[in-house]
């Protein structure tokens, strides 16, 4: 699927998706930040857009009003790393693995449980990976980091 892809400006896609979702971010008064290093990937634009939209939408939904939401896109070696760090409740370790399967949803059970499964399929198709990590501070969970790593070439 990736072989016939033209190069896509991932940083522009990330900014565009953040702009699309800005009404939801504003409605929840989230403490939002975005840092995106200019990176071009050999991937279809729609795949990167869908990946980013699903991750960001999940983060917006699970971050409490006024909470932090940070998106970072950076080059790490020969890979692009997209991190969506929310201020939500995190996930239980056994649930984290199941969230990448269709029709599994996390806390609150809202949605159909397809977003992260779609993200997983897209990252696999692009030769990358996706991981979920609870962020801890003083022994308690203060948010979830969704980390996508994709090859730059």
What spans do the regions from the language model cover?
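Short conserved segments within the C-terminal catalytic ATPase subdomain
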Residues: 24-33
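Short helix-loop "hinge" at the ATP-lid/N-box region of the Bergerat-fold HATPase_c
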Residues: 59-60
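Short beta-strand/loop element within the Bergerat-fold HATPase_c
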Residues: 66-78
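Acidic ATP/Mg2+-coordinating residue in the GHKL
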Residues: 86
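Short conserved segment of the HATPase_c
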Residues: 91-103
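Short alpha-helical Gxxx[C/S/T] motif in the catalytic ATP-binding
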Residues: 115, 119
């Amino acid at each position: 699927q990736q072989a016939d892809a033209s190069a896509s400006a991932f940083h522009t896609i990330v900014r565009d998706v953040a702009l699309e979702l800005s009404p939801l971010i504003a409605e929840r008064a989230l403490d939002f930040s975005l840092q995106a290093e200019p990176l071009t990937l050999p991937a279809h634009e729609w795949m990167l857009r869908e990946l980013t939209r699903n991750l960001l939408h999940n983060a917006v939904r699970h971050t409490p009003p006024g909470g932090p939401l940070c998106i970072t896109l950076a080059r790490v070696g020969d890979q692009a790393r997209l991190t969506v760090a929310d201020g939500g409740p995190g996930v239980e370790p056994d649930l984290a693995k199941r969230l990448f399967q269709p029709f599994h949803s996390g806390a609150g059970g809202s949605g159909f449980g397809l977003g992260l499964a779609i993200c997983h399929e897209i990252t696999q198709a692009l030769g990358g990976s996706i991981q979920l990590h609870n962020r801890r501070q003083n022994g308690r969970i203060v948010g979830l980091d969704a980390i996508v790593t994709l090859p730059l070439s």
